[in-house]
Amino acid sequence: MVSNLCKKGIVVALLLATVGCNTRAANDVSSVDVLLANEDQLTQVIIYDVFTPPVSSRIYVYASLASYEAIRHANPGTTSITDKLHGFAPMPQPEAGKQYDYTLAATKAFFTSVRKMVFSVDSLNKYENSVYNRYKQQLDKETYERSVLFGEAVGKQVLARAMNDGYIKSRGKPKYLGANEPGKWQPTPPDYLDGVEWCWNTMLPLVLDSASQCKPPAPPTYSTDTASIFFREAREVYTIGKNLTEEQKTIAIYWDDNPFVIEHSGHMMFGNKKITPGGHWMGIAAIAAKQSKVDAVVAARGFALTSVALYDAFIACWDEKYRSSVVRPVTVINELIDKNWIPFLQTPPFPEYTSGHSTITAAAAEVLAAIYGKNYAFLDTSDLAYIGMQRQFNSFEEAAAEASISRVYGGIHYRNSVDQGAVAGKKVGQLIMERVIK
């Protein structure tokens, strides 16, 4: 882990070294690098603070929207995204005829939002100060201060929406422990944690008209009949898990992205911190921006729209998870098939149907394909610094499909759950394309 953190520090240091070069030009490569470094810094904080996947999506979306709404003015005529979303007041506008550095403004907007949503604020200070100090060296005092004030105003306007999105009201709710009845979710081994974010469907969506707009069909009815659809799907998970190929194991590990994993060694327990599923796809958005050599406005738009897809997809998925509250494979298999069976991956603490990975990855893939192209090949290095793995994909859709099936390989989802999750996620992505992108 130390070596990985060192690698990340070197990357950020190199990016910071480029900030001072031609900062007035928003389409300068250094401007894109600043945005990428900002997102990467946020990912590291989210990992350190161990935010849940739904909460992480909320942090990413407000920060990324703030960044975009500030930097979009570098390209005259670029339209607002928040104007097309639910719950936002009009964004502040720059003064006509005044000089701004919009990359600096975007950075200030980004971290104005972030600082109100994470715990480890102190860890941001060194990074932010390094960025701001380099801009101070490049800009006259008036332009610097004007840019910072504009970015701060945008960030605060974005936060105004965050204060009324349902998040605060959802805190302090009683624990969700499931139901002690056949077919219903119960806390799972090894740590039997209570259900995570069971009120997430009360969050105010950005594009969806309601949390249930993309509601999937009801899951197969629970049954102990060996000929039933439910039992056959549970047995399939068991059979696959007992006969995993090395490639299937690699795929399962690669897409695990489970921030809840707790390792056990004798009487000792310790958390194995990982990137979240949403963080993985924000990393893919960064790879696409860098590989495509887009300007900073397009890069910021990619981050913003990807985060919108993740945020709404989590709301849609969690709405169904706690409505149907389907039992996890490990519970069923241990009770009905093999009491000693252990899934290849540790089961995350929330109901089974539908698969969160399948839903959010399908939504993100739809949006990224709309921005960068359907047959966009890329080497995914998002997890390289964290688990030492990378994979090549021919399209965003291919990556999403692999992420989806990985949950069956991992022994934590039934096939129907990943299939229906992908369908719902694609619907979320298509709605974003219809209402925001086109």
Question: How should these model regions be labeled?
Answer:
Residues 14:
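SAM-dependent methyltransferase catalytic region
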Residues 17-20:
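C-terminal motif of bacterial Sec signal peptides marking the signal peptidase cleavage site
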Residues 1-10:
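Bacterial N-terminal signal peptides that target proteins for export
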Residues 22-438:
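Acidic/polar surface patches and capping/hinge elements
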